[in-house]
From Swiss-Prot:
SUPFAM superfamilies listed in its UniProt record: Anticodon-binding domain of a subclass of class I aminoacyl-tRNA synthetases (SSF47323), Nucleotidylyl transferase (SSF52374), ValRS/IleRS/LeuRS editing domain (SSF50677)
Official protein name in the record: Leucine--tRNA ligase
Family the UniProt entry places it in: Belongs to the class-I aminoacyl-tRNA synthetase family.
CDD domains: Anticodon_Ia_Leu_BEm, LeuRS_core
GO molecular function, one term: aminoacyl-tRNA deacylase activity
One of the protein's GO biological processes: leucyl-tRNA aminoacylation
TM spans (from-to): none
Motif 'KMSKS' region location, chain numbering: 576-580
Annotated catalysed reactions: tRNA(Leu) + L-leucine + ATP = L-leucyl-tRNA(Leu) + AMP + diphosphate
Keywords: Aminoacyl-tRNA synthetase, ATP-binding, Cytoplasm, Ligase, Nucleotide-binding, Protein biosynthesis
Positions annotated to bind ATP: 579
Length: 820
């Protein structure tokens, strides 16, 4: 053991030891309790950033802690390798995305290993490998057979220059981020997965997720968006057709003054053929983003269609407007407008001088100026004919029943959740295994012809999908009639890859089936770690896919992740680290200067996992100083501990002196609190406990036999508490100080109940409520002994002097108050 702390050397030796001994490679073992710890897999950008390091350090602390507890721990790592970022990087560098991606993976794998994470690298997966996406294609075929994968027209953001669909974040001021072209709303044919078939179960099973953050549960509940409402039929004034409206407010039905339909509604398109003004308006609407949030905040605009509908109860004529705020994807693309009781309808009505008809007044009868603002709270019905004077809550059921009984409507449970559009007009993704034949139509690729390989030698240009230009890919023969046919050139949304990867880690070597029985052993994941930005999309899709895999008989649980931790961001100068802000700190530079253990220790100590972490250079220096202090202390006690650790009776040492028992009690109290905090995932306070223990031990001397044994016990506790957080130095010191074997094989320390037993109490002594002294008494001391000890305390006697004592109050285990 060197006298000076040399992190580069000891970390290299520890990592070589773990690799040579395959320390973290695990097998299924039914005799042991399993623990599956997983951090969200990264996109291989080529460089780890501090957000990665924090995420993976938190996961590694949890995994190593569970190893110490004797569990069979799986902690794998892989790469979310498909997607737009790799394609864009390849365009800029004029090289194939496959080459760029694999080069980055190699670089990032090395960086992860330098941090000493306890990953089972034998299970590594890369989503752009055909061995992985082959089974994704197989899964798509199963969904297609069950009617859960289907194709339909959908509205997208379309870049007319690059000839591709854009995500909302790729649009800047209404223009494509690369081409600068004005983005259009276009209806194109796309593939969808029928997640809506699982809406009710996805909502209901949120109640099972007792160890998920409440914020994530709420976000998913709102995204699924269950509502109870009524479908109401509005007949067109002319002809047999009708418009169906879904509403959660049938109590306001008598206040409808117009209907609004989406620009993509068939009726709007039909009217555009006969009106240039309407056609121009629809064209303008095409230049609006398709995101619901964008549509909600944009200026409300519309145009009169010239058509009328008939109110189902009053039989009044209602004008039908085409409005840019109505979503075709929501319900039927038709809204019944009640401007007196809906803020959006009110804003639109005032702009276009449409009538307001109040039908609910405040329950307390106070006047409301409906011209100034919509009244949206509960109240009493007015101007509603036979429904007058009914409270609005009761009116929901009364009017719903009336509509049903008169064939004008029906109750319906509605979900905000839409089916999952997985088509991407991109190259770098999983090919959708579908063939189009002029004779046979849409034909799924036979399973024995999987995988449909993505050509990896293509250099994309950014103008449309290169797969459409690659004849060797899209030209094929129909598997049914053997005539010339074409492949689907859309690729899958990369969220598909990340929706089932956690299960594939259980059997990445399996080439006969998608998942084998090992998946049932390891799933569900016991602890999942990742950012809250994935609360809705990724986590919801993974829950959906888990239920699909369960229904296919491949898994036997309802949910993919038992416990979820959403770590906070890493900030510097109050802002998230980013290259554009110039506030990035690279992990590699810190590892080179201080070592991986220092980086890990700072990351863990600086903030609780779920809170944002403010970067501090002085905090990193402090973590480094602590490890040097630990190393120096260990070097000083090395010879004494090696000698004690060779003694057979070392574990049965009895401490007699009160000061030694008190010191031991302090150590075990720190251990007790640290264990509570480990279970609560409050690792920063575990580090605080470790620092307290070291400060206690440093004051002891190895020249005293009792203290030397205290140092041995305390150091053994300290190193095991640190082992999940700073594994390299803990591994090295455990062996150098003669504790024997691999520290990971050492059981997690538990406090000794005897050490925690208090033999003496410190009580405060008051005179007329003012603090005048402190006394030490045996834990079981009688009231008489406590009174006597208090009255004989030197400072108390001085304050009493010749005063007459009226009463002595003893509050057990707390204080004595002498009244004079």
């Amino acid at each position: 053991m060197n006298e000076s702390y040399q992190p580069t050397l000891i970390e290299q030796l520890a990592q070589e030891y773990w690799e040579e001994n395959e320390t973290f490679e695990v097998k299924e073992d039914l005799s042991r309790e399993k623990f599956y710890c997983l951090s969200m897999l990264p996109y291989p950008s080529g460089d780890l950033h501090m957000g990665h390091v924090r995420n993976y350090t938190i996961g590694d602390v949890i995994a190593r802690y569970q190893i110490h507890k004797g569990r069979n721990v799986l902690q794998p790592m892989g790469w979310d390798a498909f997607g737009l970022p790799a394609e864009n990087a390849a365009i800029q560098r004029e090289l194939p995305p496959a080459e760029w991606t694999r080069k980055n993976i190699k670089k990032m794998r090395k960086q992860l290993k330098q941090l000493g994470f306890a990953y089972d690298w034998s299970r590594e997966i890369t989503t752009c490998d055909s061995t992985y996406y082959r089974w994704e294609q197989w899964l798509f075929l199963q969904l297609y057979k069950k009617g859960l994968a289907y194709k339909k027209n959908a509205i997208v953001n379309w870049d007319p220059v690059d000839q591709t669909v854009l995500a909302n974040e790729q649009i800047v001021d209404g223009r494509g981020w690369r081409s600068g072209a004005v983005v259009e709303r276009r209806e194109i044919s796309q593939w969808f997965l029928k997640i809506t078939d699982y809406s009710e179960e996805l909502l209901k099973d949120l109640d099972e997720l007792k160890e998920w953050p409440e914020q994530v549960i709420t976000m998913q509940r709102n995204w699924i968006g269950q509502s109870q409402g009524v479908i109401i039929n509005f007949n067109l004034e002319k002809g047999p057709d009708k418009l169906q409206v879904y509403t959660t407010r049938p109590d306001t039905l008598m206040g409808v003054t117009y209907l609004a339909i989406a620009p993509e509604h068939p009726l709007a398109k039909e009217r555009a053929k006969k009106s240039k003004k309407i056609a121009a308006f629809l064209k303008k609407c095409k230049q609006t983003r398709v995101a619901e949030a964008d549509i909600a905040t944009q200026e409300k605009e519309g145009i009169d269609s010239g058509l009328f509908a008939v109110h189902p109860l009053s039989k009044e004529k209602l004008p039908i407007w085409i409005a840019n705020f109505v979503l075709m994807e929501y319900a039927s693309g038709v809204v019944m407008a009640v401007p007196a009781h809906d803020e959006r309808d009110h804003e639109f009505a005032l702009k276009y001088d449409l009538p307001l008809k109040p039908v609910i007044e405040p329950a307390d009868g106070h006047d409301w100026d409906y011209n100034q603002a919509a009244y949206t709270n509960p109240g009493k019905l007015i101007n509603s004919g036979s429904f007058n004077d009914i409270d609005s809550k009761t009116a929901f059921n009364v009017i719903a029943d009336y509509l049903k009984n008169n064939g004008a409507g029906s109750r319906q449970t509605h979900y905000r959740l839409r089916d999952w559009g997985i088509s991407r007009q991109r190259y770098w993704g999983t090919p959708i295994p579908i063939i189009y034949c002029k004779t046979c139509g849409t034909v799924p690729v036979p399973e024995n012809q999987l995988p449909v390989l993505l050509p990896e030698d293509i250099i994309p240009t950014g103008h449309g999908s290169p797969l459409k230009e690659t004849a060797s890919f899209y030209k094929t023969r129909c598997p049914v009639c053997n005539k010339p046919a074409t492949r689907e050139t859309d690729t899958m949304d990369t969220f598909v890859e990340s929706s089932w990867y956690y299960a594939r880690y259980s059997c990445p070597d399996q080439d006969k089936v998608m998942l084998d029985d090992r998946a049932k052993y390891w799933t569900p994941v016991d602890q999942y770690i990742g950012g809250i930005e994935h609360a809705v999309m990724h986590l919801l899709y993974a829950r959906f896919m888990h239920k699909i895999l369960r229904d296919l008989g491949l898994l036997n649980s309802n949910e993919p992740f038992i416990r979820l931790l959403t770590q906070g961001m890493v900030l510097k100068d109050g802002a998230k680290m980013s290259k554009s802000k110039g506030n990035v700190v690279t992990p590699q530079s810190l590892i080179k200067k201080y070592g991986a253990d220092t980086v890990r220790l700072f990351i863990i100590f600086a903030a609780p996992p779920e809170q944002d972490l403010e970067w501090s250079d002085s905090g990193v220096e402090g973590a480094y100083r602590f490890l040097k202090k630990l190393w120096g202390f260990s070097y000083r006690i090395k010879d004494a501990l090696l000698a004690i650790n060779q003694q057979k009776e070392r574990s049965n040492y009895q401490w007699e002196a009160p000061e030694h028992r008190q010191t031991r009690q302090q150590i075990h109290e720190c251990l007790q609190q640290a264990n509570i905090d480990m279970e609560r995932l409050q690792f920063n306070t575990v580090v605080s406990a470790v620092m307290k223990i070291l400060n206690i031990l440093i004051k002891l001397t190895t020249d005293n036999d009792a203290e030397a044994h205290l140092i041995r016990e305390g150091t053994g506790i300290l190193l095991r508490l640190l082992s999940p957080i700073t594994p390299h130095i803990s591994h090295h010191l455990w062996q150098s100080l003669g504790f024997g074997g691999d520290i990971l094989d050492a059981p997690w320390p538990r406090p000794d109940p005897k050490a925690l037993q208090t033999t003496e109490l410190e009580l405060i002594v008051q005179i007329n409520g003012k603090l005048r002294g402190r006394i030490q008494v045996p834990t079981e001391a009688s009231k008489e002994i406590i009174e006597s000890t208090a009255l004989n305390q030197e400072n108390v006697q001085r304050h009493l002097a010749d005063k007459k004592i009226k009463k002595v109050i003893v509050v057990p285990k707390k204080l004595i108050n002498i009244l004079v």
